[in-house]
Curated annotation (Swiss-Prot):
PANTHER family, alphabetized: PEPTIDE CHAIN RELEASE FACTOR SUBUNIT 1
Record keywords: Cytoplasm, Protein biosynthesis
Gene Ontology cellular component list: cytosol; translation release factor complex
Record gene name: prf11
Identification of the protein by name: Peptide chain release factor subunit 1-1
InterPro entries noted in UniProt: eFR1_2_sf, eRF1_1_Pelota, eRF1_1_sf, eRF1_2, eRF1_3, Peptide_chain-rel_aRF1, Peptide_chain-rel_eRF1/aRF1, Ribosomal_eL30-like_sf
GO molecular function: sequence-specific mRNA binding; translation release factor activity, codon specific
Coiled coil: none
Family annotation (Pfam families): eRF1_1 (PF03463), eRF1_2 (PF03464), eRF1_3 (PF03465)
Functional note: Directs the termination of nascent peptide synthesis (translation) in response to the termination codons UAA, UAG and UGA.
Length: 415
């Protein structure tokens, strides 16, 4: 499975927003999740059964709409030779469009990650949770909490903590038994501590090195002082993992609950890492802006003009940007106009209005997503595209003060 680009993630998120907003009457919207290992023949048989059961629905309108949606699915499945590697999801049903009217709508999604469970769902809204989960961060971090008595090793995958192994030591307490000199006892104790640290390092290295190198973003170590500092200083982890240690954090527990404590303690660090690339790009933009170097552009008009002359080095687009470039035309006098519409999920499609020249009705001839347009222009000129979250101050400022569109230029253009 190939990793989604930032633009693909944006498009996927936008599509789910659109589906989330659609509502049906009663249970007229069908969601069908088909994993790769599911036989199409079996799915078809179940849909035929559901079609038969729908005949018992008392409301004639609901019965007609549900059976119509199932018939639409059966028709689509006839042309599906093989389920894609990641599975396939169908959404279909009579969507309420207001004024006591409905519209039969369908959407097909090839998910970015494999579907693991087959599901047929009939409700007044589409079932989106499995796909929305795919939008969540899947970055992986190695977790290790330890003291001289115990250690627990785990992974943080996205927001989910997985405990893999718990180790206990044979390190004796600080009080020596009778018959041993204090010096000899201390030597044996240090050897036992070293051996335990080595055992922890070997076990943690085995677990962390099994994660794909590009997916493992770093290693977090927790525990009381001075244990975690001793372990870190002794370089007991594989040398590649040693380079990925992001920090040492105080935790009171070293069992499985200590892993949760470690993640909470490192929360700010993890968020900074997740947003670091975005933060750096936005800060570079503000640096150039404050320096008045002329190597920045912001706002739709300025940035579009610089993209068209291949002057953009880094294009910054807010993840919350929702804008369409609408073209309207008059078929009578030939008047044409292009304008940008900012929108929110659930808002109706743009209306054309009347021609300012002759008064005739205008026609919407083209609608293009501004993000799609700008991403395509950036791709043609090899400009880097950075999608920026509003979860940090500068990202929020990019959206609110600059309309969610800005650029760092290769040279000053005066445009």
């Amino acid at each position: 499975m190939t990793e989604q680009s930032a633009h693909e993630k944006y498009e996927f998120k936008k599509k789910l927003e659109s589906l989330r907003d659609k509502k049906g009457r009663s249970t007229e919207l069908i969601s069908l999740y088909i994993p790769a290992d599911k036989q199409i023949f079996d799915v078809t048989n179940q849909l035929k059964d559901e079609h038969g059961q729908a005949a018992n629905i008392k409301s004639k309108l609901t019965r007609t709409n549900v059976q119509g949606a199932i018939e639409s699915l059966l028709s689509r499945l006839r042309y599906l030779d093989k389920v894609p590697e990641n599975g396939i999801v169908y959404f279909t049903g009579a969507v309420d469009i207001g004024a006591n009217k409905t519209s039969m709508e369908s959407e097909v999604i090839i998910p970015p990650e494999p579907i693991t469970v087959y599901k047929y769902h009939c409700d007044s809204s589409f079932y989106l949770e499995p796909l929305e989960d795919m939008l969540k961060d899947k970055s992986t971090f190695g977790l290790l909490v330890l003291d001289r008595r115990e250690a627990t090793i785990g992974l943080l995958v996205g927001k989910r903590i997985q405990a893999f192994r718990n180790l206990t030591s044979t390190v004796p307490g600080k009080q020596r038994k009778g018959g041993q000199s204090a010096h000899r006892f201390q030597q044996l104790r240090l050897i036992a501590i070293h051996d335990f640290y080595k055992r922890i390092g070997d076990a943690a290295s085995e677990i962390f090195m099994a994660v794909d190198h590009k997916d493992l973003k770093g290693v977090l170590i927790g525990g009381p002082s001075p244990t975690k500092e001793e372990f870190y200083g002794g370089e007991f982890l594989h040398h590649e993992l040693q380079k990925k240690i992001l920090g040492l954090f105080d935790t009171a527990y070293t069992d499985e609950s200590g892993l949760s404590e470690l993640v909470n303690a490192a929360g700010e660090k993890l968020q900074d890492l997740e947003l670091m690339g975005q933060k750096n790009a936005v800060r570079d933009f503000f640096k150039e802006l404050i320096a008045d170097s002329g190597k920045v552009a912001y706002g739709e008009t300025q940035v579009r003009a610089n993209l068209e002359i291949n002057a953009v080095d880094v294009l910054l687009l807010s993840e919350d940007l929702r804008a369409e470039r609408v073209t309207t035309k008059c078929s009578v006098c030939g008047y044409e106009n292009k304008w940008t519409r900012r929108w929110k999920p659930g808002e109706p499609a743009p209306t054309a209005g009347n021609c300012p020249k002759c008064g005739s009705s205008l026609e919407v001839t083209d609608v293009i997503d501004v993000v799609d347009e700008f991403s395509e222009l950036a791709d043609k000129s090899n400009a880097k595209v950075v999608f920026v979250s509003t979860d940090f101050d500068e990202g929020s400022q990019l959206m609110n003060a600059f309309g969610g569109i800005a650029a760092i230029l290769r040279y000053s253009t005066g445009v």
